[in-house]
């Protein structure tokens, strides 16, 4: 099997194992490997050089090696030659790379070409340089071994065993050659499967180690190989050396004998590290005796079976990190067009296992290392957490949720510190987030009465004026250690890392967050992400967001969420940035002008307070600098005058932000502030009155001066209602009791009074009273109806009057107690409420009256407001006049209706209809 062989003689003498005068089919033909046709080999024979054995010594020092050297052009493999050039039967002879083995005992050498480098180059580099230069070797005959046909493999294009744009014509050093023992699935340049003797065609390559060479010559490619890092099927049971040589070579050893079939029992233990392809252990060696260079159809079927078995082998033992993608995945070719040629003979065809095919189809364009998507053993909490059904549709982390729902409330009992130094991925942990008191934040769920624990989710959210969502540049980090008392574990929810801790009923659903740190991601990784518009260096404030899902017995899941105060995570010192800890007010009217006191840290005499307003998409629409009282301000306190809002006619509250700024980039986190619209009170045309006229027994009437505000929504000064009584003359008695019901319809006469000192809640009001005598109206007056808040507030001051006695009731206004009192020059008086009456007109009525009632043809604007039904019934069914007692007057309340500036006459009529449509037997003018 391993017969000793002689080295070639320097003079080109004969060597055993070669036939003299070989035909052209027996010669080495380099026309396929190189781009031009060679001259007659006999003409170049005298210029050939003989190569001595390398000094390092191959594994088989007696092997006869023949070399042929010629630079190889990468375009040769891309020239578009048909596969028949490599495998057509009529051109098998001249197209072979390596001649078949000749019968043992043949004498003489066949003509051959030996183009070798200089002797100095051989001594310096040894066999490595020759292999990288594209050497082709001819196998000498084996002594004592029966002749056996040997089919050969062509050398594929350079892309078959190294990356494109590689400077070296041979396979480059693998980036994983020192990590994994996986084999290259591609065709090696010196592979020739055989079924004869086990001797290698290139034994000197067996000792080339798989380490990088320290030399910078073009021997080694500057790029790593994709082929050598790929996976193949299971390994052959043939043993291999346990250690690698320390020689400064850069290539792996290529087997020239164990390519497609298994070795016979007497095979050499020396094994290639990169057989291409690797056969399965159950493939039997071929025993056909075909003299052709390529195997027949039957032998091809065996090889095809071997390749198919390779495709079904599972690469279970290969580490997952060694799987690598390719920028240009090449599918495995279909069945060859020539039945006698196996698939691996065709050029520019990659052999890919099924696992790698799937990876290359779905891989990104760049070459990356694949890692498992999930941990094989996920971290689980030590105590059970109430699990949510998998089919439940939980809201995503981007959705804003309320912190309270029904009886449940998720509350942060202890807020975190406003500054925490986040740690980078390349450095160690900086501990958990702490509280200002020295401990850690505390979160509690209120209103939960079940006995099952729940899971509290924690993630890092944004802290700007936009809607709260997971932060793009920061993630929560799980802290472990001896001082950590809270059980926690990590999981991924929608590409966001979430930390989940238990909320247990035995702890009153209260948890101390001592296991949550903040991790800073690389800005470049996030900013280059598709759709990301934020800038990492400008987005350094975060919030701790807590979320809990509460399953109910009905199957409904209640989700609550609360967020902490903003936390500054930048590397800048905390002493440089101003920080607002408290503000004494958080809202005012649109006019501003109020003073706001800010308490915090790092305030200077040059500190400014700026109010801003932004839209939901972050666009700033308003900015105004507030006035800071520098005389009162201190390093930890600022006195600020709130600026006027840009729009004074708003109808709903507007939320804005403000911040304290010490310099160009030294600003505090934004604080919230709210501007409220001015409360609107509808004012009707009011009458200015003269108290002397009201107090006089005789008068000529009331002067009226209508007052209209400049803007219905902006009240320059509050207007108050002052109730007054128009003078009424009392007539003789004789009115029957049914007429008393008519008198109940006359409401109280009140007058709007423009005054800043009166409060609407303290205005006097007098309730309608029963009249026992027929009355007539002597003077015209106007009346305005006002709400009667309650029966207690609507009280009447009533005095019985004797027959035929007239009196002039007068309303006295007392500025001390801001109440209206009714007085008279007579001891007894009657108070009557009337509406739109004027002399000169007799009011017809069902009951007989002794004197007509005079009505006024003119109508005055009135505001009719509803009166308490209880007061009306009490006035209707009240006791006789003689039994009524004197009651002290009470204040009148004013009802502020919505959209008073849009009230029209139709609305007033509707109120009137509702007012008088309640009790029956009521007549209205």
Swiss-Prot record:
Residues modified as Phosphoserine: 23, 99, 107, 110, 148, 168, 171-172, 174-175, 177, 180, 213, 217, 221, 236, 243, 255, 268, 274, 276, 280, 326, 330, 363, 755, 757, 759, 856, 859
Motif window: Nuclear export signal: 904-913
UniProt disease link: Joint contractures, osteochondromas, and B-cell lymphoma: An autosomal recessive disorder characterized by musculoskeletal and hematopoietic issues. Affected individuals develop painless fixed joint contractures in early childhood, have osteochondromas, osteopenia, and can develop B-cell lymphomas.
Biased composition (Low complexity): 264-281
Region described as Transactivation domain A (TAD-A): 119-199
Post-translational modification: In resting cells, phosphorylated by NFATC-kinase on at least 18 sites in the 99-363 region. Upon cell stimulation, all these sites except Ser-243 are dephosphorylated by calcineurin. Dephosphorylation induces a conformational change that simultaneously exposes an NLS and masks an NES, which results in nuclear localization. Simultaneously, Ser-53 or Ser-56 is phosphorylated; which is required for full transcriptional activity.
Swiss-Prot/TrEMBL induction comment: Inducibly expressed in T-lymphocytes upon activation of the T-cell receptor (TCR) complex. Induced after co-addition of phorbol 12-myristate 13-acetate (PMA) and ionomycin.
Gene expressing this chain: NFATC2
Tissue expression profile of the protein: Expressed in thymus, spleen, heart, testis, brain, placenta, muscle and pancreas. Isoform 1 is highly expressed in the small intestine, heart, testis, prostate, thymus, placenta and thyroid. Isoform 3 is highly expressed in stomach, uterus, placenta, trachea and thyroid.
Protein name: Nuclear factor of activated T-cells, cytoplasmic 2
A Pfam entry, by short name: RHD_dimer
Sequence repeat copies, ranges: 184-200, 213-229, 272-286
Chain coiled-coil ranges: none
Domain of life of the organism encoding this protein: Eukaryota
Subunit structure, as described in the record: Member of the multicomponent NFATC transcription complex that consists of at least two components, a pre-existing cytoplasmic component NFATC2 and an inducible nuclear component NFATC1. Other members such as NFATC4, NFATC3 or members of the activating protein-1 family, MAF, GATA4 and Cbp/p300 can also bind the complex. The phosphorylated form specifically interacts with XPO1; which mediates nuclear export. NFATC proteins bind to DNA as monomers. Interacts with NFATC2IP. Interacts with FOXP3. Interacts with TBX21 ('Thr-303' phosphorylated form). Interacts with KAT2A.
Motif range (Nuclear localization signal): 251-253, 664-666
């Amino acid at each position: 099997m391993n017969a000793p062989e002689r080295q070639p003689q320097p003079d080109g003498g004969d060597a055993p194992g070669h036939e003299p005068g070989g035909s052209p089919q027996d010669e080495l033909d380099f026309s396929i490997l190189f781009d031009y046709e060679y001259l007659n080999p006999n003409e170049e024979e005298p210029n050939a050089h003989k190569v001595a054995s390398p000094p390092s010594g191959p594994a088989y020092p007696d092997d006869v090696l023949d070399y042929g050297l010629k630079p190889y052009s990468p375009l040769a493999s891309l020239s578009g030659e048909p596969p028949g050039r490599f495998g057509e039967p009529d051109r098998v002879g001249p197209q072979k790379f390596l001649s078949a083995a000749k019968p043992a005992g043949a004498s003489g050498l066949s003509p051959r070409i030996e183009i070798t480098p200089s002797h100095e180059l051989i001594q310096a580099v040894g066999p490595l340089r020759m292999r990288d230069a594209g050497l082709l070797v001819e196998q000498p005959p084996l002594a004592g071994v029966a002749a056996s046909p040997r089919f050969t493999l062509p050398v594929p294009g350079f892309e078959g065993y190294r990356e494109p744009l590689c400077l070296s014509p041979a396979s480059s050093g693998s980036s994983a050659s020192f990590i994994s023992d996986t084999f290259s699935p591609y065709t090696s340049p010196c592979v020739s499967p055989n079924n004869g003797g086990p001797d290698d065609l290139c034994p000197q390559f067996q000792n080339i180690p798989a380490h990088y060479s320290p030399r910078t010559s073009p021997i080694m490619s500057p790029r790593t190989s994709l082929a050598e890092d790929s996976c193949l099927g299971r390994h052959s049971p043939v043993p291999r050396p346990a250690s690698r040589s320390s020689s400064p070579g850069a290539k792996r050893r290529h087997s020239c004998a164990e390519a497609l079939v298994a070795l016979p029992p007497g095979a050499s233990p020396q094994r290639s590290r990169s057989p291409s392809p690797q056969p399965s252990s159950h493939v039997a060696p071929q025993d056909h005796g075909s003299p052709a260079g390529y195997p027949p159809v039957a032998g091809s079927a065996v090889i095809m079976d071997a390749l198919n078995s390779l495709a079904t082998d599972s690469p279970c033992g290969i580490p997952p990190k060694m799987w690598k993608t390719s920028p240009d995945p090449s599918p495995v070719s279909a069945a060859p067009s020539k039945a006698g040629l196996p698939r691996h003979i065709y050029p520019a065809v990659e052999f890919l296992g099924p696992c790698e095919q799937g990876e290359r189809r779905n891989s990104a364009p760049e070459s990356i290392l694949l890692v498992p998507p999930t941990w094989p053993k996920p971290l689980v909490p030590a105590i059970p957490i109430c699990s949510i059904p998998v089919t439940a549709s939980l809201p995503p982390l981007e959705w804003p949720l309320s912190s309270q729902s029904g009886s449940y409330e998720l509350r942060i009992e202890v807020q975190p510190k406003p500054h925490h130094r986040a740690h980078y991925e390349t450095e160690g942990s900086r501990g958990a987030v702490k509280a200002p008191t020295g401990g850690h934040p505390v979160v509690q769920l209120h209103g939960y009465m079940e006995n099952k624990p729940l899971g509290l989710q924690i993630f890092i959210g944004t802290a700007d004026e936009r809607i709260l969502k997971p932060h793009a540049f920061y993630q929560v980090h799980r802290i472990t250690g001896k001082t950590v008392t809270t059980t926690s574990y990590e999981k991924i929810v929608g590409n966001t890392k979430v930390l989940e801790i238990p909320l247990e009923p035995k702890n009153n659903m209260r948890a101390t967050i001592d296991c949550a740190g903040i991790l800073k991601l690389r800005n470049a990784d996030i900013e280059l992400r598709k759709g990301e518009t934020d800038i990492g260096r400008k987005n350094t404030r975060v919030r701790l967001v807590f979320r809990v899902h509460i399953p109910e017995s009905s199957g409904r899941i209640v989700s609550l969420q609360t967020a902490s105060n903003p936390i500054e995570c930048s590397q800048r010192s905390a002493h440089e940035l101003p920080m607002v800890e408290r503000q004494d007010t958080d809202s005012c009217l649109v006019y501003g002008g109020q003073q706001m006191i800010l308490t915090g840290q790092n305030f200077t005499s040059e500190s400014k307070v700026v109010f801003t307003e932004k839209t939901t998409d972050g666009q700033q629409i308003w900015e105004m600098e507030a006035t800071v009282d520098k005389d009162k301000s201190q390093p930890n306190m600022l006195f600020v005058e709130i600026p006027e809002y840009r729009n004074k006619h708003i109808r709903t509250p507007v939320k804005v932000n403000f911040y304290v700024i010490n310099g160009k980039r030294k600003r505090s986190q934004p604080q919230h502030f709210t501007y409220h619209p001015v409360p609107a009170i509808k004012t009707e045309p009011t009458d200015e009155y003269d108290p002397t006229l009201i107090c006089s027994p005789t008068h000529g009437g009331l002067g009226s001066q209508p007052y209209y505000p400049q803007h219905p929504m902006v009240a320059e000064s509050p207007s108050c209602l002052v109730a007054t009584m128009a003078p009424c003359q009392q007539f003789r008695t004789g009115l029957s009791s049914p007429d008393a019901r008519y008198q109940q319809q006359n409401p109280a006469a009140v007058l709007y009074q423009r005054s800043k000192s009166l409060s609407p809640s303290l205005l006097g009001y007098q309730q309608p009273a029963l009249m026992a005598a027929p009355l007539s109206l002597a003077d015209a007056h106007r009346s305005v109806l006002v709400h009667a808040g309650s029966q207690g507030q609507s009280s009447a001051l009533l005095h019985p009057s004797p027959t035929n006695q007239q009196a002039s009731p007068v309303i006295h206004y007392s500025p001390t107690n801001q109440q209206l009192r009714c007085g008279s020059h007579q001891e007894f008086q009657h108070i009557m409420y009337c509406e739109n009456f004027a002399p000169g007109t007799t009011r017809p009525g069902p009951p007989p009256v002794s004197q007509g009632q005079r009505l006024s043809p003119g109508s005055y604007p009135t505001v009719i407001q509803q009166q308490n039904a209880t007061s009306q019934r009490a006035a209707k069914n009240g006791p006789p006049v003689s039994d009524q007692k004197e009651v002290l007057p009470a204040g009148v309340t004013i009802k502020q209706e919505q959209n008073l500036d849009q009230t029209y006459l139709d609305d007033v009529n509707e109120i009137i209809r509702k007012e008088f449509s309640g009790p029956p037997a009521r007549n209205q003018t």
